[in-house]
């Protein structure tokens, strides 16, 4: 996936579920806002490789810890508000274009590790009911999350 002409950053997002179909959400260290694990796709990088790389970097889970249940049919975009755009992703993008993946933990006791990088993005995580993230995320991502969850719920 390459940066498209519309100025959206190519990105992967992951909904990780456990055996009781609770979803993993994480709190951003710098803004204290909640979100699913997500991250950019490097230029020329395979989308699934990017997804597994981000999963490992952000929450310490490997490909062996999860099963790939499914993915969104296409991509979903959201705009970053102009008032904060200069502070997000260096102001280079007007938003993100995300490919969404649904992953299931193979073992509920798989360890979630948030300190896998020199500058971890998250400082806390929780397992919550499937729709609860819609009430806890920043407003500008809400519709993208609703669209992704509405599509992925049929795969559970």
Residue ranges and their predicted role:
Residues 1-19, 90-91:
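Acidic, metal-coordinating catalytic segment for phosphate/diphosphate chemistry
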Residues 16-19, 28, 103-105:
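Active-site beta-strand termini and strand-to-loop segments that position acidic
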Residues 30-32, 95:
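A conserved beta-turn-beta hairpin within the catalytic core of GNAT-like acetyltransferases
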Residues 35-39:
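A short gly/proline-enriched turn/hairpin at secondary-structure junctions
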Residues 41-139:
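Unchanged
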Residues 130-156:
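Charged phosphate-binding loop/patch that engages nucleotide di/tri-phosphates or the phosphate backbone
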């Amino acid at each position: 996936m390459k940066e498209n002409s519309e100025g959206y950053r190519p990105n992967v997002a992951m909904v990780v579920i456990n055996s009781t179909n609770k979803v993993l959400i994480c709190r951003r260290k710098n803004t204290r806002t909640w979100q699913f694990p997500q991250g950019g796709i490097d230029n020329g990088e395979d989308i699934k490789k990017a997804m597994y790389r981000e999963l490992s970097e952000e929450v310490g889970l490997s490909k062996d810890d999860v099963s790939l249940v499914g993915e969104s049919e296409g991509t979903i975009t959201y705009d970053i508000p102009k008032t904060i755009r200069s502070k997000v992703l260096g102001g280079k993008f007007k938003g993100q274009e995300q490919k969404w993946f649904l992953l299931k933990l193979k073992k509920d006791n798989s360890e979630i590790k948030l300190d896998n990088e020199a500058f971890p993005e998250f400082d806390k995580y929780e397992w919550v009911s499937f729709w609860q993230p819609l009430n806890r995320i920043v407003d500008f991502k809400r519709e993208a999350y609703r669209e992704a969850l509405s599509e992925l719920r049929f795969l559970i």
